Structure formats: structure tokens, C-alpha cells
């Protein structure tokens, strides 16, 4: 028989419960004190008399990172940072649409090798930028988007233009943070700038609520009641608000490092480089395809070009790598890429992806040995489990890899008949282009002929910005950029509407360059209003609008396959007159002055050199040049 346990004394559980309750209460109070910054405030005081504001901290970090321009469309949420940038000598360039500001920052990033910066106001100001931010993500452009926001205290309470902005931008940005205290502005922005350029470059987003940007006295006026409230609840609320405000500004103006943080850029290992050297050294018909990543810092374009010339392997150039070898270089192969890839025995994909542009890898021969190098592992191996397989996949910086590859292949040569075979195919294709340029069109001008004349007129110091479908697709075959980083297209996202923003960023980054924008008439509709921006800021750029009164790239497939041109028609609009209404110069090219194409182009150049933005409205007919081109 078991002896029953002695019953516990009735009051013995109470001290334990009391201890647990007290501990929980203390922990809760300590947590609340930490969140309110009460401990931080003991060591870092609030300068209540200061008229300084968080915008000054933003501007100081941007200046320390070498930022010279900030693109914006003004809004009350971000006014302090714009004013502070102006005071520190950072040029504030305001556009007529927020998406243009981000496109301009994208172009600035691509051409400068640093971070492009745009600032827009809260809510709809930010949502207007989503397309441009996604475009920058897919183009791997390091941009910093600064977004205004409602007060930290009023978020999720129905404030004006308050939405969950971080949720919108997390899928698009490498780094996505909302600043909650003034003292956090500097370290957050430094981390954002480093993240934008490290690894695979891309956009970053920093949300700046109004109460971390405006001065103490203004935030206090909005946040804390002027008269002390009566009653216990009122006093508790007042105490909470005063401490919340103090935490916002505690230590706000204490000195902090503002300069750049170290970047994390992946590099190929010596063993990987050596294996690639051995593969390429045995090649008989080597081929290289260079993409935009090859032009990323730290490798300069001049060093990369010298390395490619030393290597002696024929190249296809895409994206920002277009123009790397200049005009008519013997190693630069421009046409018949699919056929060349099928014939090559070793292919180096240097910053090039097997997406739709390489038919998802289907254009690569299974008998070819493929070396692929890319900073992004996921992108590097895209579709490799389906249509192609790399012999060597190297995650690392493309430009640095090419330089190391050339070092390992010193003295290596390849039979000249392989390059000559590819160049002969180029010459045959160019002959067909000349024949198409000579063909009459039903009305207006032959776009192939016009673009050949553009190619002959284009100066060596030009930067080409291309924005459109059919007209721009034709230009890609006929007009050659004169050097590296002199061709700006949207990239893999295929975005229409990049033209004005890209031109804006390009001209400010390279003021001595002539910026030539090639627009389709459909795409030009997105950019027309920004000629007001060019006029106001005295930014002379030249726009050539291929005006065939339609969305022709879509119409080419829609009409024969579906039997209707619905939604594809536009008008032969007087875009040159519309530009003149905005204060720019406007010129017209049509069948009436078809013998003066070069003269009109020279007139446009001269007006640009005199400081005026110019639109040349080129009325063109339709040809079969791009029949069968991809529209989806």
C-alpha cells in the first residue's frame, strides 16, 4: 500500500508566482524602455534647439560617396533631403514623372560605374517607379531609391499616401530598409550603397519617413500637444510621445563615418581560371559572347578592350558591351550569331545569359565546350538543366576573369580562317541590308536607308539611347556605337519608355558627348513631356523619332496571324511641333525632303551644340526588314 504524498502548504506557490509575474513585468518594462530608447537617451542627448534636419545627413552620405546628381519629382515628404543636397553642391534634377527619375539614375549608374540616386515622395510617387526599379534589377544597375513615407508614428493609421512600401520593393531590391531614427540615416545609407554595388549589382531602397527628415521643432509641433493634457491617460500619452520624439533625435548630430564601405565582389579562383585556359587553348573555332556584366567596375573598359584584342577570339557584343571594340573591328562579329554558335567548338559566355536572347540555350551546340562566367549563380546556370550544359561555370567578376584568362593564354593564336569565315557571313548580311535600303516603300521614307545615313553621320563622341520596337530593332543591325558604354537600351526587361530618362542621365554624366536617342513613335509617347525637363535644365539631347504611325513590331505578327490590326494603329503625329510647344527645337523629315536627310541631321546636331534639345520627326514607311522578329 502506497503512502500518500504530503500535501504542499497552501501558500508555497504564491511566492513563485509573484516572482514570475515580477520578472515578466520587469522584462516588459525593460523591453519598452529599449524600444523607446530610454537607455540610449541616457548617454546621447537631444539638441532641442538645433534647426538641423535628417536631410542633411542624407546629403552628407551621398556627397561622401561621390554622388553628383540626384533625380527627383518633388514632394513634401522629401523636401529636406533635396534642399540639403542643393546646399552641398549635389545637383537636383527634377523630372515630370517619377519613372523618368529612376531611369536617369539607372543611366548614371551604368555610365559612371557608381550608384545612381533618385528620390521620390511617398505612396503614388513610389508606386510610379516600380517599372523602372524592376528594369534596373534585371539590367543589374546599382541604383539607390530614396522614398518618403508617413511619420513613423502614423504608419498603418490611415495617414496621407501611406502604404506598405517595403512589401512593394522587397521583391525588386537587394536591400530594403525603413529608417526609424535620425541617427540611423548614415549607417543605413552606407550599407545600402555598398549592397547596390556588391555581388550582382542592383537597386536598393531606403524609406525615409517625414519625422526622420524634418527638424526637431517641426516634428515636435506635429507630434506633441502644445498644452499639457489633463488626466492620467493624457499624461501617459504625453510622456510616451515626448520619449518617442527624444528617441527619434537622440544622438542625431554626433559625428559618424560617412564614406564608402568595402565592396564584396566575387572573383574566379586560380584553379577555375587555369581549367578555362586549358579548355580554350585546345580550341580550333573559339567564340566569345560578351554581355553587360563585362563592363562593370573594377575592370576599366580600356583594359577589357585591350585584353579582348590580345586574346584574338572573335566576339559578339551585347548590352553595355556593344561598342567595346569600336566600329568595324575585325574581331567584332555582328550578324548570324546562332549559326556561329552552332559551329564554334569552344564558347565563352562572359556575362551573357541563356534566356530568350540565346533561345534559352538551344542555339548552343551539344558538341561545344562552354565556359560561362557570371557574378550571379542562378543566372549563370539558367536553363542549363534543359537545353545546354557548361563545361566550366565560374561565379565571379566577368571583366577580371577575362583579364586573367588572357594572362594564361599569352602567345596563343588561332587560325585566321575561322574569323574570316564569320566576317564573310557578316559581309553577305550587310549586302542584303544595302539592298533593302534601296527598295522603295509605299509612303514616306525607307527606315533602313534613313538609319544607314544615321550610321554615316554619327560622331565618335556620341552616346546612343534606344527606346522602341521595330525602328530600334532595325537600328540594332545598322547603327554601331562608337565605343564602350555608348549604347543604352533597357536590357532584358524590354521596357518601353526608358528613352528620356536614359538620355537625361547620359548627358549629365558625359556632358561632352552628343546624346542621340532613337525612338519608335510608340515609345516616344512616354518621353515627350520630358522635353520640358530638358529645356528647363538646359540639357541638349537629340531625338530621332521613327514615325510609322503604329505599334509596328506587334502589328507584324498580329495582322497575319490573327487577321486584325486592332490597337496597333497610331497617327502620323507632329511630334516635332509638340516638342516646340515645350520649348525644344523641332525638325521634320519626310518624302518632301528625302534628299536632305544628312543636312537635317547636321542641323539638329548644330542646334544641340548651341544648347537646345531637338526632336527630328522622321516619317517612315514599312519594310519587311524585321519580318519574323520576336514580339513576345
Curated annotation (Swiss-Prot):
The keyword ATP-binding does not apply. Expressed in all tissues tested, with highest expression in heart, pancreas and placenta. One of its GO terms (biological process) is isoleucine biosynthetic process. The chain crosses the membrane at residues 13-33. It is a single-pass membrane protein. Residues 470-550 are annotated as: Thiamine pyrophosphate binding. Its main location: endoplasmic reticulum. It holds the Pfam family TPP_enzyme_N. This is 2-hydroxyacyl-CoA lyase 2. It comes from Homo sapiens (Human). The gene is ILVBL.
Amino acid at each position: 500500500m502506497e503512502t500518500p504524498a504530503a500535501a504542499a502548504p497552501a501558500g508555497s506557490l504564491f511566492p513563485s508566482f509573484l516572482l514570475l509575474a515580477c520578472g515578466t513585468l520587469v522584462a516588459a518594462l525593460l523591453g519598452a524602455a529599449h524600444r523607446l530608447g530610454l537607455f540610449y537617451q541616457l548617454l546621447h542627448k537631444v539638441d532641442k534647439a538645433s534647426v538641423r534636419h535628417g536631410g542633411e545627413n542624407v546629403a552628407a552620405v551621398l556627397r561622401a560617396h561621390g554622388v553628383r546628381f540626384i533625380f527627383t519629382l518633388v514632394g513634401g515628404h522629401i523636401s529636406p533631403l533635396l534642399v540639403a543636397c542643393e546646399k552641398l553642391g549635389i545637383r537636383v534634377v527634377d523630372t515630370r514623372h517619377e519613372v523618368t527619375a529612376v531611369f536617369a539614375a539607372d543611366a548614371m549608374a551604368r555610365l559612371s560605374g557608381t550608384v545612381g540616386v533618385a528620390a521620390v515622395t511617398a505612396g503614388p510617387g513610389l508606386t510610379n517607379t516600380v517599372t523602372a526599379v524592376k528594369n534596373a534589377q534585371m539590367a543589374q544597375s546599382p541604383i539607390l531609391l530614396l522614398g518618403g513615407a508617413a511619420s513613423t508614428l502614423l504608419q498603418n493609421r490611415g495617414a496621407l499616401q501611406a502604404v506598405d512600401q517595403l512589401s512593394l520593393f522587397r521583391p525588386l531590391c537587394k536591400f530594403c530598409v525603413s529608417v526609424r531614427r535620425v541617427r540611423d540615416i548614415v549607417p543605413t545609407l552606407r550599407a545600402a550603397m555598398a549592397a547596390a554595388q556588391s555581388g550582382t549589382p542592383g537597386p536598393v531602397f531606403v524609406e525615409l519617413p517625414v519625422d526622420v527628415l524634418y527638424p526637431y521643432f517641426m516634428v515636435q509641433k506635429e507630434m506633441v500637444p502644445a498644452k499639457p493634457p489633463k488626466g492620467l491617460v493624457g499624461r501617459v500619452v504625453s510622456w510616451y510621445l515626448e520619449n518617442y520624439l527624444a528617441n527619434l533625435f537622440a544622438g542625431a548630430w554626433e559625428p559618424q563615418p560617412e564614406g564608402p564601405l568595402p565592396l564584396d565582389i566575387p572573383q574566379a579562383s586560380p584553379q577555375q581560371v587555369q581549367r578555362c585556359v586549358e579548355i580554350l587553348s585546345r580550341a580550333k573555332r573559339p567564340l566569345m559572347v560578351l554581355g553587360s556584366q563585362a563592363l562593370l567596375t573594377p575592370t576599366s573598359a580600356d583594359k577589357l578592350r585591350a585584353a579582348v584584342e590580345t586574346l584574338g577570339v572573335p566576339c559578339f557584343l551585347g548590352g553595355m558591351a556593344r561598342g567595346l571594340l569600336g566600329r568595324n573591328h575585325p574581331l567584332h562579329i555582328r550578324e548570324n550569331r546562332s549559326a556561329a554558335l552552332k559551329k564554334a567548338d569552344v564558347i565563352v559566355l562572359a556575362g551573357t545569359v541563356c534566356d530568350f536572347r540565346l533561345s534559352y540555350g538551344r542555339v548552343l551546340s551539344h558538341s561545344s565546350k562552354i565556359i560561362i562566367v557570371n557574378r550571379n549563380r542562378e543566372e549563370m546556370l539558367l536553363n542549363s538543366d534543359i537545353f545546354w550544359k557548361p563545361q566550366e561555370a565560374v561565379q565571379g567578376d566577368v571583366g577580371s576573369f577575362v583579364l586573367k584568362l588572357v594572362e594564361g593564354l599569352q602567345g596563343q593564336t588561332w587560325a585566321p580562317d575561322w574569323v574570316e569565315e564569320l566576317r564573310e557571313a557578316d559581309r553577305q548580311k550587310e549586302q542584303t541590308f544595302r539592298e533593302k535600303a534601296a527598295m522603295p516603300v509605299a509612303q514616306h521614307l525607307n527606315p533602313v536607308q534613313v538609319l544607314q545615313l544615321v550610321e554615316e553621320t554619327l560622331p565618335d563622341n556620341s552616346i546612343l539611347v534606344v527606346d522602341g520596337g521595330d525602328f530600334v530593332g532595325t537600328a540594332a543591325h545598322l547603327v554601331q556605337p562608337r565605343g564602350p558604354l555608348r549604347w543604352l537600351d533597357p536590357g532584358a526587361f524590354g521596357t518601353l519608355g526608358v528613352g528620356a530618362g536614359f538620355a537625361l542621365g547620359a548627358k549629365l554624366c558625359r556632358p561632352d558627348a552628343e546624346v542621340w536617342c532613337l525612338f519608335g513613335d510608340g515609345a516616344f509617347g512616354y518621353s515627350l513631356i520630358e522635353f520640358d525637363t530638358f529645356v528647363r535644365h538646359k540639357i541638349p539631347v537629340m531625338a530621332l523619332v521613327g514615325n510609322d504611325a503604329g505599334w509596328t513590331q506587334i502589328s507584324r505578327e498580329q495582322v497575319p496571324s490573327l487577321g486584325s490590326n486592332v490597337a496597333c494603329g497610331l497617327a502620323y503625329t507632329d511630334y516635332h511641333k509638340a516638342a516646340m510647344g515645350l520649348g525644344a527645337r523641332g525638325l521634320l523629315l519626310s518624302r518632301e525632303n528625302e534628299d536632305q536627310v544628312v543636312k537635317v541631321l547636321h542641323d539638329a546636331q548644330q542646334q544641340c551644340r548651341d544648347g537646345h534639345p531637338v526632336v527630328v520627326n522622321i516619317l517612315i514607311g514599312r519594310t519587311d526588314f524585321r519580318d519574323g522578329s520576336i514580339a513576345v
